[in-house]
Amino acid sequence: MKKSFLMVAAAAAMLVATGFTACKPNSTPKEIDIYVAGYENSGTEDAAKVWKNGKELYELTDGSKDALALSVFVVGGDVYTAGYEDNGTNKVAKVWKNDKELYELTDGSNNAIASSVFVADDKVYTAGYEGKVAKLWKNKSATDLTDGSKDAYAYSVFVAGSNVYTAGYENNGTNDVVKVWKKGSEHLVLTNGSNNASAYSVFVVGEDVYTAGYESNGTKDVAKVWKNKKEIFHTDGSKNATANSVYVVGDDVYVAGSEGGVAKVWKNKEELYDLADNGGAQSIVVHNGDVYVAGDEKEGSTRAAKVWKNGKELYSLADKGGAYSIFIVER
């Protein structure tokens, strides 16, 4: 089952653009720029947007048709954004570079969404779906991860060296099954299909593949994280919960998601921050020990797009909107 975007981390947990290496001792911390992808509703439809340091950077669509920006990746001063724009009949998967459309990945004949973007070696990798098929695009060239006989979706893509990892789900005829693909082929099957489950985020360190998502226990959705094939984190199952984004620094595993409608961050299986009593934590990045999260919080009858730093609100981006992906670049 394709999950509502208001509660999905469509973006992959993003690395800091300068790499994973920690700052050298006694070095002066560099200033950073914080990029966020999401949407704002200022009329009848959602407009795809990118913010930089709390201010609107790009309005990717004009708001005349429904659109979302679900993932952002910055490299070499260029801002790549993945999402979709409705054509009046179906959703069309798209990638933008800076404020211009770069790729229209699908022709609009079937519903399609680009959920995650990752740029490596001047190649643009995008994960998503078209129709019932989970897909991975390299620039504009598509690879079908599934055969289309059952519903499937690729939510997250991560490139590590020459390996391209994609995470999502494929239905087995009864329930959705968590899967990770590597170089376009099935790599890990993380649930047995007895209950619905999905992966929303994949993060790779060396040979270790971390996957975040959820698995139903039959009555409630349980937030889960797997390291390779082993489950390493789960909520207690008393409330609906999901792990939307995972980020790893050394031996520390950070997770953003929600439990019982509360936006939360966990670190090494323990709750670290309770961000909002009625909200969702969609994407997480850790930089120089600081924890940055993009998501949304319900305020009155609407949801507001937010960024938190170390558990405290840093930016309110849109009074009516949502934030799905965060990316940090050192200046």
Regions found by a protein language model. Give the residues of each.
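Bacterial Sec-dependent N-terminal signal peptides
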Residues: 1-8, 13-33
